[in-house]
Amino acid sequence: MATPPKRMCHSPVFNNSFEKRVKKLSIEGNIAAGKSTFVRILEKASDEWEVVPEPIAKWCNVQTTENENEELSTSQKSGGNLLQMLYDKPTRWAYTFQTYACLSRVRAQLKTPSPKLLEAEHPVQFFERSVYSDRYIFASSLFEFQNINETEWAIYQDWHTWFLNQFESDIDLDGIIYLRATPEKCMDRLHTRGREEEQGIQLEYLESLHYKHESWLYDRTMSVDFENLQHMPVMVLDVNEDFKYDKIKQEALLDKVKEFLASL
């Protein structure tokens, strides 16, 4: 697959030397495909790799001291469990949730790298999902399930496009890693991990998300509005077989990631 030219970066946040060296990738996949397990493996694999996790704790309003990405702002502390609210009353909370989810992803992709990463010779940032999957997978699916109405969907697309155009040079990605698993396997893993907010998720919803991931990242037939996204390199990893406790499978996945990085 042809690789597009390295993006132009004009961010005042980081020095030009770092921006020329760093590679930014998102880890995409269905709910419970294995992303959290995968990014933990990545984080341990190299001192030059940094993982920016999905801010689940923020969405659940859970205060934690384990990771600064999971801390809450003052305005959130009495905001309730937005993820639970989404699953309990999707038609009421879908637009609110997707608006906040996208905002939190923009913040994550603009976050200042760690000092260790700034000094790395070959720095890599991995983001657990991205502003693109927020729109083309999750918000789109909620609209198709009629949990987001036409007016909300039009507004979401309008500000999402404007937002990304404003920050394009700072949040653009070099590539995407798609963790591919069947909806049935994702359902099994969802039940195994036992996240309370997710217990009402139906297989039909996972099938819808799977179809969208396939269209976007596997078949590459999905229509997208951002030119950089149309030609972005994608590596597909089959994670239908469990790899959480299998060191051989983990090493095989890491080898593929290293090959992909070398091609960018």
From Swiss-Prot:
One term under GO cellular component: nucleus
Class of this enzyme: transferase
Keywords: ATP-binding, Kinase, Nucleotide-binding, Nucleus, Transferase
Annotated substrate binding sites: E54, Y87, Q98, R129, D134, E198
Active site, renumbered: E128
GO process annotations (BP): deoxyribonucleoside monophosphate biosynthetic process
UniProt similarity note: Belongs to the DCK/DGK family.
Name the record gives this protein: Deoxycytidine kinase 2
